[in-house]
């Protein structure tokens, strides 16, 4: 039997390779940080979600070791059997305190949080209205739910309003959006979304994965940026980006919503609890962020420094409020060649092109971190400038 599907898979894989879409893993032989080791050489890392530079933070590493010593290596159980330790509850409270919400539920990943949030809450008589550029995990979560589905053009409030008008016959309506869209780096217009939600009696859900730790005066995310703390019904997020970069996701928001997810959210009910090391480090991470805004302030300064340098060099940079800087190249092959040449120059980035982004919108996505020094940012800008001139992207 396998011989038949083997031939089919080999053909599909060959087509993926021929189209230049085959994904290869680039092996790192160092901790995740601003400068990493790849293929036996050191390179500057500008493609990680390590926004606050915490992935190799000594304080978090020590907290993880301490939690493992005191609470063990793993839980070997789901939460509602014997997989809930006191530190899991402590981390859930820390998340709620950070975002100004009523309660929190932890997941193995934010993919699980987004995948498990809709089906327990909404049914055939309800409507889910989702931004067209939402993350794949939201798309998959919506597919698992029987609610009527609407999709509006990215951050297009006129289109969103039309969807809300069409959904008025449904029992409940919920608007779902990424806080920051990962390919362009643009932030959702949450103030306008909330205004429309109030006008048309809809709930609001925001995925804070790329906005938490980044947006807002103190980095508390998009709800802080738009002065909507405690007003958004559902927030999802991850410990795998700004918050240390390990694993783990969460949903935080209205108390009754979180309670229902504990009863019926399948990824929560049928997945092991987060391991103590991750939980202990997460608690310490939120403690650090409560003590000081230094890392967030450094990130904001680094993003501004990098964007100004790149625009001065003549590059086309997408407008952004986040730590994601999309350097537009438009041509797919050029984006691949540019990324390869940058690695030769000691800068580790990735070129993105169709179907990850629309045709003719190829780019290199640069992700700035609080862990980058000014010298490292300048070296990155210099490398971009050198390669940009070689490939006739800039003069």
Spans of features found by a protein language model:
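PLP-dependent enzyme catalytic core of the Aspartate aminotransferase-like
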Residues: 3, 58, 62-66, 70, ...
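N-terminal "arm"/small-domain region of PLP-dependent enzymes with the aminotransferase-like
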Residues: 7-73, 202
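Short loop-beta-helix segment that forms the pyridoxal 5′-phosphate
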Residues: 78-84, 93-116
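Conserved PLP-anchoring active-site segment centered on the Schiff-base-forming lysine
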Residues: 117-136
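Active-site phosphate-binding strand-loop segment of PLP-dependent enzymes
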Residues: 150, 154-206
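Active-site C-terminal subdomain of aminotransferase-like
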Residues: 200-203, 210, 215-321, 334
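Conserved PLP-binding catalytic core of the aspartate aminotransferase-like
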Residues: 297-306, 311-346, 356, 360-361, ...
């Amino acid at each position: 039997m396998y011989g038949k599907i083997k031939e089919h898979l080999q053909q599909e894989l060959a087509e993926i390779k021929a189209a230049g879409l085959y994904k290869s893993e680039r092996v790192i032989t160092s901790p995740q940080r601003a400068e990493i080791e790849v293929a036996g050489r050191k390179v500057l890392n500008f493609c990680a979600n390590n926004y606050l530079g915490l992935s190799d933070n000594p304080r978090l590493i020590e907290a993880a070791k301490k939690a493992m010593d005191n609470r063990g290596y793993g839980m070997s159980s789901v939460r509602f059997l014997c997989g809930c330790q006191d530190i899991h509850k402590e981390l859930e409270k820390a998340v709620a305190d950070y975002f100004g919400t009523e309660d929190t539920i932890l997941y193995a990943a934010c993919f699980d949080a987004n995948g498990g949030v809709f089906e327990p809450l909404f049914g055939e008589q309800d409507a889910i209205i989702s931004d067209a550029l939402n993350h794949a995990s939201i798309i998959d979560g919506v597919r698992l739910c029987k609610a009527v589905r609407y999709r509006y053009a990215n951050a297009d409030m006129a289109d969103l309003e039309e969807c809300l008008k069409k959904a008025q016959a449904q029992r409940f309506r919920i608007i779902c959006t990424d806080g920051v869209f990962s390919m362009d780096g643009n932030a959702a217009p949450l103030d306008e979304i909330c205004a429309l939600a109030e006008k048309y009696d809809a709930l609001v859900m925001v995925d804070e994965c790329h906005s938490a730790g980044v947006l807002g005066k103190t980095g508390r995310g998009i709800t802080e940026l738009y002065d909507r703390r405690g007003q958004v019904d559902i927030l999802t997020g991850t410990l795998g980006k700004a918050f240390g970069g390990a694993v783990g996701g969460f949903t935080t928001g209205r108390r009754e919503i979180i309670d229902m997810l504990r009863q019926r959210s399948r990824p929560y009910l049928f997945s092991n609890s987060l391991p103590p090391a991750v939980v202990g480090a997460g608690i310490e991470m939120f403690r650090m962020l409560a003590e000081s805004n230094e890392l967030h302030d450094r990130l904001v300064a680094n993003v501004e420094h990098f964007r100004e340098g790149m625009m001065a060099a003549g590059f086309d940079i997408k407008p952004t409020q986040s730590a994601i800087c999309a350097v537009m190249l438009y041509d797919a092959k050029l984006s691949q060649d540019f990324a390869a040449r940058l690695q030769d120059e000691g800068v580790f980035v990735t070129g993105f092109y169709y179907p990850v982004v629309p045709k003719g919108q190829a780019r290199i996505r640069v992700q700035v971190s609080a862990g980058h020094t000014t010298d490292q940012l300048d070296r990155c800008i210099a490398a971009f400038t050198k390669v940009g001139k070689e490939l006739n992207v800039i003069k």
